[in-house]
Curated annotation (Swiss-Prot):
Gene: Naaladl1
Residues carrying covalently attached carbohydrate according to the record: N128, N141, N235, N279, N302, N329, N456, N497, N593, N620
Family as reported in the entry's similarity comment: Belongs to the peptidase M28 family. M28B subfamily.
Name listed for the protein in its UniProt record: Aminopeptidase NAALADL1
Keyword Transmembrane helix: yes
Listed GO biological process terms: peptide catabolic process; proteolysis
């Protein structure tokens, strides 16, 4: 046992050394030491400071931030985007309200833009080559803000150039199952153009699926049944309501992965190795173009052929048919085809992240990162500027306290404004690739506030299970907007809730996919993360997102008139995010409850037993080791929780606090296995990787099982099921091991 004693001494020495580590690459100038005579190793959350911050977060300042941020289009790397870089630097270097330091990090990344001299187009062409109808290349200028040289034409970023022409078919949401259904209906898809609607699968997946079946071009539109509760008339839509107008077109990246396409797993520095852009995976294989539902109606309501299935029908005021081609007595001559002309260009551009830093007084080498992306497709008042407006207000209030000398956090706070998010989470991913080791070793948590306000009904929170407790604690102390007198927590539970076997009725915490800048932090680095926003009442609308998402109608006036007239919901998000930020950066013991993972694991286990268990037994694959691993994790998490409670009742020395906090911080990393999903770029988290199966359980196991169930699957497929089961069991055992006393194995 002598080696155990040596290990214990080494761990203690390492922890002592850790208390003295500074931020290194993210350090503030040495002349402005953060340490004061009042600094104590036992520094804890100061409730008076917390109350002061809550009181100073100002809705009117958030409003003015948003007006400034969204007054011009600011697509990534544009002159206005770079002007906002300087705005952020100026705010964070302000002598009265700024932070300790601020700087930019630049990356040379591959972006995709439409050709201003040769706009993309969609036409109906007759059998003799005559163009009978050309669809509008831009959205209608309804408020004077939808036109001008800086308003990008609607396009599918990273779709390849080309001018395919063919008979039109309707392919619903463009899933693999949708294209198989068309073939089941006897439709030959070879050489056709597919009209699809947003939803169901990712943007890029629609084109990838289409190409597999011989389709040569894809159109994508937003159906009013999916976004407008079926409303589509001009007097029912923007600018007369919050609904998407008929000419509105959702832009977006059609790249399948995240990060710079040419430098996967490497930061996109000028000197970095780059892939050949012509042989890079993840791009749409065929020309693709989004259109408005006004244009989609002209196409879809003139299609011939069999009626589409009931669940493929939408709200364009006609019966949707499958095609191919148009009705002979419709608006277009018999035999007419659709021509899709895409002239997108790939360009290497320099994109900037902006980081503002407050160095911690006690544990400067422990980071709480708060991030939001800066770039938009057009004005981006909601996405992302509502989040940037909140970020700037939180940093102003904390910066003011910092400059007055009345407060400095226990741990370091890093504010991040990410670049080029809309093209595939590029800025945040490049940052994690550049500082992978440092961030994995030192980051406590990542807070993401992308869109801060979808609407003004209730909080929507997503995150990994350990953040549930800190979000609940914060929201119980903050009043919800309006006159209800409820806390944000009590208002939230009215709209979305679940019954926990441990806590009873609680608000529902959603899971994190890969839809915003938390993706690389969760899936690549294994960092505890969350995403916070205010949203709408889903009992009153079925909209899949706020209706003007990624269009030229997402403007300041849209926010002020329809989403949050008094900006009280923006203020509520600022208070929630600010409270969570302070609790994570200032609390002596990290307010992360690892036992909340036990509920998730038990739920996954139960789903696997019920849906997969019988068939697995037939293949001589036992879930017994998984049952044991889940039980061991639950026991270890509960034991650590009891240990923390005991320490909180005493006067623990700094080493004890540091060791426990490191266990809480590092738990998420234990779920990483970079070889678990070799086909999935950047996905290493065995609990939160993409689950394409219908069973809500461990994703690798669910996906492998679904594939093994396919016709003609052989022993190799079931071997992969066994491998994925072993990966999960090993991860859970490793996670449990991180929670036991640090000198034990």
């Amino acid at each position: 046992m002598h080696w155990v004693k040596i290990l214990g001494v080494a761990l203690g020495a390492a922890a002592l050394l850790g208390l003295g580590i500074i931020l290194g690459h993210f350090a503030i100038p040495k002349a402005t030491s953060p340490l004061t005579s009042s600094t104590s190793d036992s520094q804890d959350l100061d409730l008076a400071i917390l109350d002061s911050v809550m009181g100073q977060l100002d809705a009117s300042r958030i409003r003015e931030n948003l007006r400034e941020l969204s007054k011009e289009p600011h697509v990534a790397t544009s002159p206005r985007d770079e002007a906002l870089v300087q705005l952020l630097l100026g705010r964070w270097k302000d002598t009265a309200t700024g932070l300790d330091s601020a700087k930019t990090y630049e990356y040379r990344v591959l972006l995709s833009f439409p050709n201003a001299e040769q706009p993309n187009s969609v036409e109906v062409v007759g059998p003799n080559g005559t163009t009978f109808h050309s669809f509008q290349p831009f959205e209608k200028n309804l408020t004077g803000e939808q036109a001008g040289p800086n308003v990008l034409q609607p396009y599918a970023a990273y779709a390849p150039p080309g001018t395919p022409k063919g008979l039109l078919v309707y392919a619903n949401q463009g899933s693999e199952e949708d294209f198989k259904e068309l073939e089941t209906q006897g439709i030959n898809l070879e050489g056709t153009i597919a009209l699809t609607r947003y939803g169901g699968v990712g943007r890029g997946a629609k084109a990838i699926n289409a190409a597999k079946h011989g389709v040569v071009g894809v159109l994508v539109y937003t159906d009013p049944g999916d976004i407008n509760d079926g409303k589509s008339l001009p007097n029912e839509t923007f600018p007369n309501s919050w609904r998407l107008p008929p000419s509105g077109v959702e832009r977006g990246s059609y790249y399948e992965y995240f990060g710079d396409p040419l430098t996967p797993y490497l930061p996109a520095h000028p000197s970095s190795f780059r892939l050949d852009p012509h042989n890079t995976s993840g791009f749409p294989p065929i020309p693709t173009q989004p259109i408005g539902f006004e244009d989609a109606r002209d196409l879809l309501c003139n299609l011939t052929g069999t009626s589409a299935p009931a669940f493929w029908q939408g709200a364009l005021g006609c019966e949707y048919k499958l095609g191919p081609g148009f009705e002979p007595n419709g608006s277009f001559p018999a035999g007419s085809e659709v021509k899709v002309s895409v002239h997108n260009r790939l360009e290497l551009r320099t994109s900037s992240n902006v980081l503002g830093i407050i160095q911690g007084a006690v544990e400067p080498d422990r980071y709480v990162i708060y991030g939001n992306h800066r770039d938009s497709w057009v004005h981006g008042a909601v996405d992302p500027s509502s989040g940037t407006a909140v970020l700037l207000e939180i940093s102003r209030v904390l910066g003011t306290l910092l400059k007055k000398g009345t407060w400095r956090p226990r741990r370091s706070i890093i504010f991040a404004s990410w670049g080029a998010e809309e093209f595939g989470l590029i800025g945040s991913t490049e940052f994690t690739e550049e500082f992978l080791s440092k961030l994995q070793e030192r980051t406590v948590a990542y807070i993401n506030v992308d869109i801060s306000v979808f609407s003004n009904a209730t909080l929507r929170a997503q995150g990994t299970p350990p953040v549930q407790s800190v979000i609940f604690s914060a929201t119980k102390e903050i009043s919800a907007p309006g006159s209800s007198g409820l806390s944000i927590y009590d208002n939230w539970i009215r709209y979305t809730n679940r019954t926990s076997p441990v806590y009873g009725l609680v608000p529902s915490l959603g899971t994190l996919g890969a839809g915003s800048d938390y993706a690389a932090f969760v899936h690549f680095l294994g960092i505890t993360s969350m995403d916070l926003a205010y949203t709408y009442d889903r009992s009153k609308t079925s909209a899949r997102i706020y209706p003007t998402y990624h269009t030229a109608f997402d403007t300041f006036d849209y926010v002020e008139k329809f989403l949050d007239p008094g900006f009280s919901s923006h203020q509520a998000v600022a208070r929630t995010a600010g409270s969570v930020l302070l609790r994570l950066s200032d609390s002596l013991f990290l307010p992360l409850n690892v036992s909340d993972y036990s509920e998730t694991l038990q739920s996954f286990l139960q789903a696997a037993q019920e849906a997969l268990g019988t068939q697995l037994e037939k293949q001589n694959i036992s879930l017994g080791p998984l049952v044991t691993a889940v039980a061991n994790f639950k026991a270890a998490a509960a034991s650590l929780g009891e240990h923390i409670l005991t320490l909180q009742k005493s006067s623990p020395d700094p080493l004890q606090v540091r060791m426990v906090n490191d266990q809480l911080m590092l738990l998420e990393r234990a779920f990483l296995n970079p070889r678990a999903f070799p086909e999935e770029r950047h996905y290493s988290h065995v609990l939160w990787a993409p689950n394409t199966a219908s069973v809500d359980t461990f994703p690798g196991l669910a996906n492998a099982y679904a594939k093994a169930q396919e016709i003609n699957s052989g022993s190799e497929a079931w071997a992969e099921v066994q491998r994925q089961l072993s990966i999960v069991v090993t991860a859970l055992e490793g996670a449990a091991a991180t929670l036991v006393p640090v000198a034990d194995l």
